[in-house]
Amino acid sequence: IQYNSKATGGGCNKGHMLGSAERTSSTETNRQVFYYTNIAPQLSSGFNTGGGGWNLLEDYIDTQVVKDTLYEVVGCYFETFTDGYGNAVNPKTISFGGRNDVSMPTMFYYAVLRTKKGNSGKSVKDCKADELQCVAFVRAHTNSLKGQEPSSKEMMSIADLERLTGFSYFAGVPNAPKDSFKASDWGL
């Protein structure tokens, strides 16, 4: 993907799907989060800045790590999306004055998987369903989330996220409990 110096403005910025702070083990791994394959247009004010909706969800996800690990799949959605509060976000495009408009996502999500206790001592692919937890956190792409911490209304099962997006998550973990979750397991 070719760099476009005009790809900022219009009230949005180049938002990282996986944040730079998540990859600090080496300069090379940190450099990889700046590839365009890890970038999506995000609203600046109220969503992708300090105290913004996405920023607060990123911070919350960081608190969900257990000793074993936390597997994260981060993505965005471009069709009409209705959040857990009943608010609909419709698809739109942003123009930067060039020939091509940029489609704006209507929703961003984290699909996360972890062991329940954090000390199983084995790979998640070898765990039984009752040893694992997984859930999707979904946030509407809107500036109205500034200062709003994630809530249980923004959670859905991995199976529901798969139906919505058409993608399969945690395919290498055959016992992942994709059909259900408890908000209380995730502190909500």
Place the predicted regions along the sequence by residue.
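Domain-level detector of nuclease and nuclease-like folds
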Residues: 1-188
